[in-house]
Curated annotation (Swiss-Prot):
Inhibins and activins inhibit and activate, respectively, the secretion of follitropin by the pituitary gland. Inhibins/activins are involved in regulating a number of diverse functions such as hypothalamic and pituitary hormone secretion, gonadal hormone secretion, germ cell development and maturation, erythroid differentiation, insulin secretion, nerve cell survival, embryonic axial development or bone growth, depending on their subunit composition. Inhibins appear to oppose the functions of activins. Residues 30-47 have a biased composition (Pro residues). Keywords: Cleavage on pair of basic residues, Disulfide bond, Glycoprotein, Growth factor, Hormone, Secreted, Signal. Its main location: secreted. This is Inhibin beta B chain. Disruption phenotype: Inhbb deletion mutant mice are viable. However, the deficiency affects prenatal development with a defect in eyelid fusion at birth and female reproduction. At 2 months of age, Inhbb-deletion mice display 2-fold higher insulin serum levels compared with WT controls. The keyword Repeat does not apply. Belongs to the TGF-beta family. Glycans are attached at residue 97. GO terms for molecular function: growth factor activity; hormone activity; protein homodimerization activity.
Amino acid sequence: MDGLPGRALGAACLLLLVAGWLGPEAWGSPTPPPSPAAPPPPPPPGAPGGSQDTCTSCGGGGGGFRRPEELGRVDGDFLEAVKRHILSRLQLRGRPNITHAVPKAAMVTALRKLHAGKVREDGRVEIPHLDGHASPGADGQERVSEIISFAETDGLASSRVRLYFFVSNEGNQNLFVVQASLWLYLKLLPYVLEKGSRRKVRVKVYFQEQGHGDRWNVVEKKVDLKRSGWHTFPITEAIQALFERGERRLNLDVQCDSCQELAVVPVFVDPGEESHRPFVVVQARLGDSRHRIRKRGLECDGRTSLCCRQQFFIDFRLIGWNDWIIAPTGYYGNYCEGSCPAYLAGVPGSASSFHTAVVNQYRMRGLNPGPVNSCCIPTKLSSMSMLYFDDEYNIVKRDVPNMIVEECGCA
């Protein structure tokens, strides 16, 4: 019984190391390869940066960790670890299979309308706040995702046009739809109007009512047209009902009263009008009740061997994922390295848990709770905004949690 607390605390240290950063995917392998954001295995005792206070569960003594910048190039194991981490954060089983791209004109139009972004000459997208750094307000309780889905059509049904969209609900999470809109372009053809008159039409958008698959609800909007342009129609109720049914396909029937008489043409799915293809924008919220305690952490500057944060940039082009990740072009994932001597218990931000503080207080008093050593691990993680294609060719914009290591500490 005397050894039980030590063994229990030792197990807690190991569990905290593995589960605290890598997440559930780490349990599939007893010795997962290091990732840029995960704490790398420390050097063996006696090597630079090594310490007898280093947690043995952090990496063992068989050869030191080679930093990415020391490799000259990133090896295959390192790349695979980075890929697994990104996919797990996006809740994807594998990279989306992009066999045919969304028409560039349609994508550019949607991005300009929603994000004031721009497309560079080399085809890359630049959007403010999607630069690979932490998202503004990333530590808040709410995370908002934005999903853009482009229309397909089943053709004409009586006086209505059937549009359908495949809308991802972000890994079947319990999302609450904050706002959802259909964007529809109305084009004016040459038409002789009486002096002082305008073209006024009524657009109706029909969607399936929740709980009644054979019943349709309708959103109506009177549109006063001066020129060709985009118009939005609220469909929040339709998207929320879709998510609650656990479905992905959204069917919308669009009808425009008086359009034909007034030479107004709603643009649907026309190969000659790709830049005006209809699209749906969904803003959804997922609450997060977790609170983080802000701590200060050390930055690795080449002059310290203590636990610190090492910056490291991950380039999506380097790993061959720039075809489905639209923005950013890469991000600072960072990782933790360094030793954790017992006296760090008194340094602000170095003790990352109550468990660590208790163990170190035992040590400072000359007591031995068991063979427990501290590990240098991430103590603060932040979200990052990403814009990417999913398997249904939706453009998804979301704040992805736990992507960037902000601070490191000992546990």
